[in-house]
Design a protein with these regions (language model features):
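Conserved, mostly hydrophobic/aromatic
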Residues: 45, 72, 153, 214, ...
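Metal-coordinating catalytic core of metallo-dependent amide/deamination hydrolases
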Residues: 6-144
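C-terminal cap of metal-dependent C-N hydrolases
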Residues: 248, 260-299
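Short, acidic/turn-prone active-site loops that include or flank metal/cofactor-
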Residues: 164-169, 184-190, 287
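Active-site glycine- and acidic-residue-rich loops that bind
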Residues: 47-58, 143-148, 152, 160-162, ...
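Hydrophobic residues within beta-strands of alpha/beta enzymes
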Residues: 1-3, 72, 161, 211
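His/Asp/Glu-enriched, well-ordered alpha-helical/loop segment
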Residues: 176-186, 190-271
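Glycine-enriched alpha-helix->loop->beta-strand junction motifs that scaffold or abut catalytic
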Residues: 66-70, 153-160, 175-181, 206-209
Length: 299
């Protein structure tokens, strides 16, 4: 699992001690240490870098140089573009975390502040991407919403288009050679929680290469069967979207992602119980790390 941690510049989306630079660094060091000790699954670190966090530039460079991360994504949650093209959705999101009245600011004041913040420069992002690639780290862009953004991603050296906002952008990203990612919860919900692209529709049209767990890990397995039963996708094709394709995107497909001679025996065995897929066995490096037996159900 690639554990995702965000480096935010402020507390727009709520106060979280996990998003401070000290906590992010501590978690990265902990995950790196766990990977070298006894563990049930493989652990990796995904740094989600908000480009309005100008102080994070030096932190990210240090973490890359110390080989603490295995993926980095450039995120821009500035209102008026990306995930928050619709300012009403932005207002609802901000209010969900803390009402503007409690902050003593009007929504317009908050909007102006976040639309005019200093950002990391193109040169800095390119430098981070180059340093990442030198250390065999995959680079992603987040919430791509225009074809122009994709062109910029190409200039920066981005590998992955993570959560493209529209199917047009997802299709273009796929055709340009980016790995395109959608969230599995999107499939279970029947669409984006932010009113953006439908993952199921994009998969049917061949615009999505990878499904990720996003904010609900259990959605990964369930979504594969929903796409088969409800939308007629083949199970092998869907499994590739959560195994082989992600492994290729992360540059680890030599050892992971498919059942082939010479690769690591990392396997998940599932069964159907009461109409829902359930995990019964997990094997890591050929060793069983989890086995679950459901009462009254023979496997």
């Amino acid at each position: 699992i690639y554990h995702s941690f965000s480096l935010y510049s402020d507390e727009l989306l709520g106060k979280s001690p996990l998003r401070t630079k000290e906590s992010v660094l501590e978690m990265a060091e902990l995950i790196a240490d766990i990977q070298n000790r006894s563990h049930l699954i493989h652990h990796r670190f995904h740094l989600r870098l908000e480009i309005d966090n100008v102080d994070a530039f030096a932190i990210a460079k240090d973490m890359i140089a110390r080989k603490l991360i295995q993926e980095i994504s450039f995120m821009d949650h500035t209102p008026g573009q990306g995930q928050y093209r619709d300012l009403e959705i932005y207002r609802e999101t901000v209010d969900k975390y803390h009402g503007m009245e409690n902050e003593g600011k009007t929504f317009e004041e908050v909007l102006e502040h976040h639309q005019n913040k200093k950002m990391l420069s193109i040169a800095q992002l390119r430098e981070l991407a180059e340093l990442a690639h030198q250390n065999h780290i995959t680079v992603a862009s987040h919430d791509d919403d225009t074809l122009e953004k994709l062109q910029l991603n190409r200039q920066l050296g981005v590998d992955i288009s993570e959560f493209p906002i529209t199917e047009e952008v997802a299709k273009a990203a796929h055709e340009m050679g980016f790995y395109t990612i959608a969230g599995a919860p999107n499939i279970l919900l029947g669409g984006s929680h932010s009113g953006n692209m439908s993952a199921a529709q994009a998969i049917q049209n061949g615009s999505v290469d990878i499904l990720c767990s996003d904010y609900f890990p259990q959605a990964l397995l369930h979504s594969l069967f929903v796409m088969r039963e409800k939308y007629g996708q083949t199970l092998p094709d869907m499994v590739n979207k959560v195994s082989l394709n992600p492994a290729k995107a992360m540059g680890i497909d030599k050892d992971y992602g498919s059942i082939e001679p010479g690769k690591k025996a990392d396997l998940v065995i599932a069964d159907i119980l009461d109409g829902y897929p359930v995990v019964t066995h997990v094997l890591v490096d050929g060793q069983t790390t989890s086995r679950v037996e459901y009462r009254g159900h023979s496997i």
